[in-house]
């Protein structure tokens, strides 16, 4: 068997649908966004969109509509999933807790029926009498809406018109009436039917219209007073209501296809339209009032408002704000202005919602050489195309930096007690202290009266009674604010030097070697309260007040040399409350008591970058739940700071980290800076909510990005990226991309817009000796769109496009690899292409081109003609392995720098994907699942080892280990095949057994080995083997890792128990959602653990946790089974969350 754990590292980001209404209350305006399996609920405020709740559905959201039946005070939500689970949801809030209640649910799948090519359509009658669904050709399904019905029951009505393009319910009809566009051999037509609930039949509708535009694709039902429907086509927009027929053909809409629409006004006088090029239009219905007071339509008008992201859906929010939901680019709320700007646009983007989808390809690289992978994806399409650099951690935006080597500490000050913001920064150096005055964004050096500047400062700050304090190696100095003067000074009785110190607003603890002294701060006086001797020298200490102790800390935390211990002492007596031996040789360098999400912790960092953290009881001073993580390799300094009103800790070291709490568990996120030795929070007029950071040579002031798990940087390329690879020697990425050009009158083509391939620093064009340009059998016509393919060379540091190489006309670049070949010392970019002509069923010729990029120049080293499309290429034992149509071929690289065929394997339909390990080759086929080949170096040929005989239409493949192979197929499933080495007969051995099945609910485009987290983080006891990342069409990034059998069994048990405790939204069974499902078969999931479900354990209440662990057997590593506690499982799950 094979045991795997699959989990989401980045939730889907592509927006598939959006609606607006009054869901959370009658007064709120809500925006609901569907991102595949996730539903996000926002409330529209004057400041912008405020997130209320995010709901994970057990299904892909196919239909999402708000409606309000009679007797309801606010809107209800109807959702239908791709596996035909229907539910009606209601928002309930009591105090802090928010629940999404399932009012009614049911599955509306038919046992037979052909799913419609135009997808699932779900509509609701405006009077809320019924829900209509078009799921299968020739059938219209009706769900009657009864208030009391807990179960959604549906019936089918036969529809003679098999090929329905779009359907809507009309407004203002006595009986529910549908209006639809359908296609038959004669063309496209519009028809209406009344739906009779009693007879469960269609009755003749009020009107119909034969032979509308051949490309008519959308129906918009218009509310009263107009009524009727608008039909939108490629070139024309028409209005019908039985009496009135009006058609317009504005040239402006011809360039592209309109794909979405949304009503602006309740009376239907204005509609927003969005097209495939990202243009936003307004459709206006002009009215005419008749003598008898009725209103009829006078005219239709279309106006271009401007350009947005390419819209998948549009919804009008309020006050001229429209939400543009995008699948191919970032989504954005946009403001519609009355007047146009200089570019003639009426649209302004207000903010952007990052979308990684569709992830077409990706690679993992460690650019910073820090042992941490970054994921670089080819994301988006057309003008929304971009590269996304995704790393685990937090970004800091630099606002100012000053060259100041040797900083040993820094603190913010308010020089005037009445100020709200900091205006001074105190910097400490060996043997001296300097003071910087902040004036707006200007920084100048100054002197503070009462402060000494010829000694190193250990602490400095504003303290009680409007005073300042400076602790230096010689003394503790209390300075009055008005006037600035020294009012009290404490020195060690024998005038010894202070070694470490800590201070809060009214308490000071200093250490002099082994001696500890406790002082209190009074008006104009430092009062020594107590002192004690420890058995070893004090290495670090802290007196941060926790809880509601009025700024006084009853505890003091210290770390000692020699015995390497952390201790909690009681103040003022210095009585020992708890002693924790840390073990090892390395001394504690920094200790900190802090509170995250109302839980108290003690953090203790050692000189080698290790960090211990404990739960701290502030009443007793006892430590519990000892845990250890490795943050860096250098001594670590811990400092607290606040961000968005929550406390976080910054760990300064060679790998700076922010420690924060999420769902009552600590999260360690690294920061995108090389090293930080010291930091302090800074909130000045010129630099609000900032951080001051010092490394060996520089002082930097910056602000921190929103604290979250992943940091995403966008590099727009404004065309479609297809493939990416990294080349270390040239410090570049190679990217295959394609831009759209339009045939002009002269027979040439022109680009639609500037993009990466037209804006590169240098460029070149293929001229092939293999194909003469006149060989093109295909003539394009005026106005036709053609794809132009390029290889882009992109700098790994600046992401500048250094070079763009354009391929031949009709030549599609399909595969890309960077590698060395044979004994040749050079590293090459190699591109596989196909010549694509519309009249050919599959490509008959293509080429493999070998490029070398060095010294800023791209040279073509070799090219090889092939008889087909080069779908995939990998470097294989110093040779080049390629799949060409149905053939897998191995090329060797000769001394003459030519590719020579060594051997072939022919038994495929279409070999799309190749992965290798050692001498093994995994081939992913278009429709025949996966195949395992072995290369025999002695014979110089391929041997077919085994294949999966199930028909799977593959979208990506990966080798997990020597015996297990991962596949993703086009019905959103994952599966694992296993080589059966122990089989007795040859026939059994030739079968790859499907040992893992799982419904991911995402279309996977790419798998790659790698991880987004530091590889040595924490002493983990959860053995996960390997890490494969996956990228999907919806911008979701997932991770698959292998488990041992015992861990799999524990997690499977836990998964089953969680399913009993966690109630799913829409009452969809988890086992139904995750079952492997294709048109051919449905089988229960096996061999996979649903990591998202396991991780949800951390979000449930303590009593529910107890319910899950009741009688659960658990082996804590001692080999003995015992009953698990909730804390055992919390530890296990927390460790699992750290793998992504």
UniProtKB/Swiss-Prot annotation:
Pathway: Protein modification; protein ubiquitination
Gene Ontology BP annotations: apoptotic process; biological process involved in interaction with symbiont; cellular response to UV; DNA damage response; DNA repair; ectopic germ cell programmed cell death; epigenetic programming in the zygotic pronuclei; negative regulation of apoptotic process
Pfam families in the cross-refs: Beta-prop_RSE1_1st, Beta-prop_RSE1_2nd, CPSF_A
In-chain residues carrying the UniProt-annotated modification N6-acetyllysine: 1067
Purpose of the protein: Protein, which is both involved in DNA repair and protein ubiquitination, as part of the UV-DDB complex and DCX (DDB1-CUL4-X-box) complexes, respectively. Core component of the UV-DDB complex (UV-damaged DNA-binding protein complex), a complex that recognizes UV-induced DNA damage and recruit proteins of the nucleotide excision repair pathway (the NER pathway) to initiate DNA repair. The UV-DDB complex preferentially binds to cyclobutane pyrimidine dimers (CPD), 6-4 photoproducts (6-4 PP), apurinic sites and short mismatches.
Family to which this protein belongs: Belongs to the DDB1 family.
The protein's assembly and partners: Component of the UV-DDB complex which includes DDB1 and DDB2; the heterodimer dimerizes to give rise to a heterotetramer when bound to damaged DNA. The UV-DDB complex interacts with monoubiquitinated histone H2A and binds to XPC via the DDB2 subunit. Component of numerous DCX (DDB1-CUL4-X-box) E3 ubiquitin-protein ligase complexes which consist of a core of DDB1, CUL4A or CUL4B and RBX1. DDB1 may recruit specific substrate targeting subunits to the DCX complex.
The protein's name in its UniProt record: DNA damage-binding protein 1
Native source organism of the sequence: Rattus norvegicus (Rat)
């Amino acid at each position: 068997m094979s045991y795997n754990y699959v989990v989401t590292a980045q939730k889907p980001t592509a927006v598939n649908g959006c609606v607006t209404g009054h869901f959370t209350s009658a007064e709120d305006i809500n925006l609901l966004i569907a991102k595949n399996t996730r539903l996000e609920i926002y409330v529209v405020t004057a400041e912008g969109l405020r997130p209320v709740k995010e709901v994970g559905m057990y299904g892909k959201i196919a239909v999402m509509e708000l409606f309000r039946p009679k007797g309801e005070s606010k809107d209800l939500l109807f959702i239908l999933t791709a596996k035909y689970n229907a539910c009606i949801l209601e928002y309930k809030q009591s105090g802090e807790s928010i629940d999404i209640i399932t009012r009614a649910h049911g599955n509306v799948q038919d046992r037979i029926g052909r799913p419609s090519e135009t997808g699932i359509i779900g509509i609701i009658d405006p009077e809320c009498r019924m829900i209509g669904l078009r799921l299968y050709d020739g059938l219209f399904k009706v769900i009657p809406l009864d208030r009391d019905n807990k179960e959604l029951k549906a019936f089918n009505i036969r529809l003679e018109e098999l090929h329905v393009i779009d359907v809507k319910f009309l407004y203002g009809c006595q009986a529910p009436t549908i209006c639809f566009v359908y296609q038959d051999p004669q063309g496209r037509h519009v028809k209406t039917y009344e739906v009779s609930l009693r007879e469960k039949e269609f009755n003749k509708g009020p009107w119909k219209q034969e032979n509308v535009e051949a490309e008519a694709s959308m129906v918009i039902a218009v509310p009263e007073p107009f009524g009727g429907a608008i039909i939108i086509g490629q070139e024309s927009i028409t209005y019908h209501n039985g009496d009135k027929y009006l058609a317009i053909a504005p040239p402006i809409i011809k360039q592209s296809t309109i794909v979405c629409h949304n009503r602006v006004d309740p009376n239907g006088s204005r509609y927003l339209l969005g097209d495939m090029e990202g243009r936003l239009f307004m459709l206006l219905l002009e009215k005419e009032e008749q003598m008898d007071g009725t209103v009829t339509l006078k005219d239709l008008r279309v106006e271009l408002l401007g350009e947005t992201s390419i819209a998948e859906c549009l919804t009008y929010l309020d006050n001229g704000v429209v939400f543009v939901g995008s699948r191919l680019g970032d989504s954005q709320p946009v403001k519609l202005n009355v007047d146009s700007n200089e570019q003639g646009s009426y649209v302004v983007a207000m903010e952007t919602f990052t979308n990684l989808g569709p992830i077409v390809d990706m690679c993992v690289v460690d650019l910073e050489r820090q042992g941490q992978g970054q994921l670089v994806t080819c994301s988006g399409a057309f003008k929304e195309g971009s590269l996304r650099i995704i790393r685990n951690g937090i970004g800091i935006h630099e606002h100012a930096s000053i060259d100041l080597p040797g900083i040993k500490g820094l603190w913010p000050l308010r020089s005037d007690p009445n100020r709200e913001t900091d205006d001074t920064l105190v910097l400490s150096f060996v043997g001296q202290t300097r003071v910087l005055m902040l004036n707006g964004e200007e920084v100048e050096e100054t002197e503070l009266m009462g402060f000494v500047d010829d000694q190193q400062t250990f602490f400095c700050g504003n303290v009680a009674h409007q005073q300042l304090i400076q602790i230096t190696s010689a003394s503790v100095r209390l300075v009055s604010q008005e006037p600035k003067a020294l009012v009290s000074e404490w020195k060690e009785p024998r005038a010894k030097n202070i070694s470490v110190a800590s201070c809060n607003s009214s308490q000071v603890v200093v250490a002099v070697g082994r001696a500890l002294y406790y002082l209190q701060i009074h008006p104009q006086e430092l009062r020594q309260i107590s002192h004690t001797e420890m058995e070893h020298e004090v290495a670090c200490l802290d007196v941060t007040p926790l809880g509601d102790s009025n700024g006084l800390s009853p505890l003091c935390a210290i770390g000692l040399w020699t015995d390497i211990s952390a201790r909690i002492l009681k103040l003022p007596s210095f009585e020992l409350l708890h002693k924790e031996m840390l073990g090892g040789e390395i001394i504690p360098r920094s200790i900190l008591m802090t509170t995250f999400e109302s839980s108290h912790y003690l953090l203790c960092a050692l000189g080698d970058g290790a960090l211990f953290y404990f739960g701290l009881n502030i009443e007793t001073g006892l430590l519990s739940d000892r845990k250890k993580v490795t943050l860096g390799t250098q001594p670590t300094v811990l400092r607290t700071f606040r961000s968005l009103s929550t406390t976080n800790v910054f760990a300064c070291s060679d790998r700076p980290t922010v420690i924060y709490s999420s769902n009552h568990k600590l999260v360690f996120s690294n920061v995108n800076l090389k090293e930080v030795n010291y930091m302090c929070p800074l909130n000045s007029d010129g630099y609000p909510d900032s951080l001051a950071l010092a490394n060996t040579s520089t002082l930097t002031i910056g602000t921190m990005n929103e604290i979250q798990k992943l940091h995403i940087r966008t590099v727009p390329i404004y065309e479609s990226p297809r493939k990416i690879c990294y080349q270390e020697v040239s410090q570049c990425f190679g990217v295959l991309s394609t831009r759209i050009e339009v045939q002009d009158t002269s027979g040439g083509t022109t680009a639609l817009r500037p993009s990466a391939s037209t804006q590169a620093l240098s460029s070149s064009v293929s001229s092939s000796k293999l194909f003469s340009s006149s060989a093109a059998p295909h003539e394009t016509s005026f106005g036709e769109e053609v794809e132009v393919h390029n290889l882009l060379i992109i700098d790994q540091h600046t992401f500048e496009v250094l070079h763009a190489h354009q391929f031949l006309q009709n030549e599609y670049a399909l595969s890309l690899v960077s590698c060395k070949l044979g004994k040749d010392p050079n590293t090459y970019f190699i591109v596989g292409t196909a010549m694509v002509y519309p009249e050919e069923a599959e490509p008959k010729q293509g080429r493999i081109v070998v490029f070398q990029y060095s010294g800023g120049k791209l040279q073509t080293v070799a090219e090889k003609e092939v008889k087909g499309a080069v779908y995939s290429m990998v470097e294989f034992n110093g040779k080049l392995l390629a799949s060409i149509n149905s053939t897998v071929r191995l090329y060797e690289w000769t001394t003459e720098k030519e590719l020579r065929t060594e051997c072939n394997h022919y038994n495929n339909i279409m070999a799309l994907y190749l992965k290798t390990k050692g001498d093994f080759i995994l081939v992913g086929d278009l429709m025949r699942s996966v195949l395992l080949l072995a290369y025999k170096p002695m014979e110089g040929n391929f041997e077919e080892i085994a294949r999966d005989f199930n028909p799977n239409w593959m979208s990506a493949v990966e080798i997990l280990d020597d015996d297990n192979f991962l596949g993703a197929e086009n019905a959103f499933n994952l599966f694992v095949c296993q080589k059966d080495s122990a089989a007795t007969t040859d026939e059994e051995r030739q079968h790859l057994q499907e040992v893992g099945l799982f419904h991911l609910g995402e279309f996977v485009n790419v798998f790659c080995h790698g991880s987004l987290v530091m590889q040595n983080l924490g002493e983990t006891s959860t053995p996960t083997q390997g890490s494969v990342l996956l990228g999907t069409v919806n911008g979701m990034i997932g991770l698959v890792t292998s488990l041992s059998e015992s861990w799999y069994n524990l997690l499977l048990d836990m998964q089953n128990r969680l399913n009993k405790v966690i109630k799913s939204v829409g009452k969809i069974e988890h086992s139904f959602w995750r079952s492997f499902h294709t048109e051919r078969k449905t089988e229960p999931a096996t061999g996979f653990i649903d990591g998202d479900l396991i991780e949800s354990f951390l979000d449930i209440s303590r009593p529910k946790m107890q319910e899950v662990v009741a009688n659960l057997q658990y082996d804590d590593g001692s080999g003995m089974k015992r009953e698990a506690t909730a804390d055992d499982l919390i530890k296990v799950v927390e460790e699992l969350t750290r793998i992504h």
